[in-house]
Amino acid sequence: VPQAKSNKLQVRLVDGKGNVCGETSLTVSSRQWKTYKAVITAKATADTHLEIIPQSVGELNLDMISLFPQNTFKGRKNGLRKDLAQVLADIHPRFIRFPGGCVAHGDGLKNIYQWKNTVGPLEARKAQRNLWGYHQSMGLGYFEYFQFCEDIGAEPLPVLAAGVPCQNSACHGDLRGGQQGGIPMSEMGAYIQDILDLIEWANGDAKKTKWGKVRAEAGHPKPFNLKYIGIGNEDLITDIFEERFTMIFNAIKEKYPEMIVVGTVGPFNEGTDYVEGWKLADKLGIPMVDEHYYQTP
């Protein structure tokens, strides 16, 4: 706060007619990054927007602004919106796939979903855009996902890129073709370790393992008992894909032989990728594959 010892912010909810439906204030006094929290109690039910108004002269840097309900599903900290989560719970799904789709393998190598950026303090998580063109705050990260699965009795099925990004990377508008590419072989060891670290984070002992301790510090000392892990999403079954998928698959089976790896057989339930995907599955002995059907029942 360069020009003031402290700076008060008015924080309020305002409807389309300019009526204030709830407000509070925050006093910012630190010159360092710091988390500030306050509670707004709504005085009406309305379609509103959030306003943050400085009350003194100065300069402020704001980051990770979040308006979040106190009453979450199962009362979980940073949990899911209660009504939407209940809809999912009422379906009684046997598993939940996350983050799923092209979000998992991303728009190019630098956009591949990194699970480690989604755990830990909310304000420290690394946000990024996704292939669909919108922003991910990572507020719903792997911890919240695993916790939700546990709360509704569903098996978690995390999906990680198979060392390649989406083949539609860099496609815009009606342009098609894209590029698949692949993580450089010199970096595959580190990428595979990230995947193994996820399994340790989910299932590792809270006192004996590095990532099990991270999970415990987030509020879940007991393992999540992860049984399934998806590798790849609707990928073209190319030499680039096969080489990297095989490396990942073998590494998982060596360290965690009990883990059920779910493979991919291309974006459709027919065609070259489907056929080649099944050939690879048979060759490696992949226990389960994820077929995708874009058809009406």
Report residues per predicted region.
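An acidic- and aromatic-residue-enriched active-site/binding cleft used to recognize and process polar
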Residues: 4, 14-16, 55-57, 67-70, ...
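Active-site neighborhood of glycoside hydrolase catalytic domains
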Residues: 190-197, 201-297
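Short, well-ordered coil/turn segments that N-cap beta-strands
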Residues: 45-48, 57, 92-94, 152-156, ...
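A conserved hydrophobic secondary-structure block that centers on an alpha-helix together
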Residues: 74, 146, 151-188, 198, ...
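Aromatic- and acidic-residue-enriched carbohydrate-binding clefts of CAZyme catalytic domains
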Residues: 104-142, 169-193, 204, 210-231
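Extended acidic/polar, glycine-enriched regions
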Residues: 1-90
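Active-site-adjacent substrate/metal-binding segments within catalytic domains
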Residues: 10-12, 60-161, 210
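Carboxylate/His-rich catalytic cores and anion/metal-binding grooves
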Residues: 85-104, 182, 186-203, 283
